[in-house]
Amino acid sequence: MNADTTFAVVDLETTGTSVKDGDRMIQFGCALVRHGKIIQTISQMINPDRSVPQTIQRLTGISPERLVAAPYFDEVAPALHQVLTKTVFVAHNVNFDYPFLNAEFERIGLPKLQLEAIDTVELAQVLLPEISSFRLSDLTTHFAIQHDNPHQADSDATSTAKLLLQLKARFQALPTPTQQALIQRHDGFIRETGDYLKMIASPPRPLKKEFVQVGPLVLRRPTTTPTDLATAGAYPATELAKKHLLQPRYRFRKAQAKMMDAIFTHAQKTEIPLFIEAGTGLGKTLGYLLPYAYLATPEQKLVVATST
């Protein structure tokens, strides 16, 4: 594949999952993508010459009445085969659509397609690790892609084509080291999905200021807003004040609050050492850091040394 390749983004609606078991196609949808644009769409109803399970009718909204006048697959297969030849096959779960379509071609005596193939499910899993669902309907919602008729092949194919373009842009926006790390693992992707990433990779560019590279990883630089607690108000001496400052994640512990108050009071009034015995789980780190944060200033710095 190269920059001039035509990508055939295909979706099939079928009576089931196995051509060998007698399942057949009821709708073929395809969106042809070239140079980053959808250049043609194809929608074809197909008479399966068998009953369509009620579950499939409910899922797709395609009734047997709509299929009665549709052509049989062997009537449209030569034209579909010609359209797909010399393209790169793309599907959302390519290991279903591509083998099923090839099995249908073989069934009527046409040669199997020998195409490179890309899986948009895997692309989404790699490029959108933060989302919880990789169903086409959820991904189109994530990218605000209009998807009028889920589980109808023409709508699914067009939506998958738009998803492919969104995922391409997502990959090309990644920092160069991240792109290169994914490309190095291209052999582990489904079919030629990894080769597609290699083909669309952006030219090397320096990291933006908000990123830092740590070994093979590129991380966003931590951004913090320093807070001068000494000028942020009075030390929270009461239980209510401590809860107001630290909630919602803070769980008030009476012994910890007592430790805070003792350290704050001691630091202001005496140079006599203060010894505190505190059990495991009391929250000693916050117990001494909070009062010291109210005592430290740019002019009067504090150093805390600890072995834990």
Residue ranges with predicted function:
Residues 1-117, 129-151:
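Conserved non-catalytic scaffold segment of RNase H-like nuclease domains
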Residues 2, 166-238:
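Acidic two-metal-ion nuclease catalytic site recognized across multiple nuclease folds
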Residues 14-16, 96, 122, 159, ...:
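Short, glycine/acidic-enriched loop or turn micro-motifs at the edges of active sites
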Residues 152-167:
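Acidic, divalent-metal-coordinating active-site segment for phosphoryl/phosphodiester hydrolysis
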Residues 226-277:
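Conserved pre-motif I regulatory segment
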Residues 268-291, 302:
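Walker A/P-loop
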Residues 294-300:
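Post-Walker A helix-loop "phosphate-sensing" segment adjacent to the P-loop in P-loop NTPases
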Residues 300-308:
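Conserved Walker A/P-loop ATP-binding site and its immediately adjacent core
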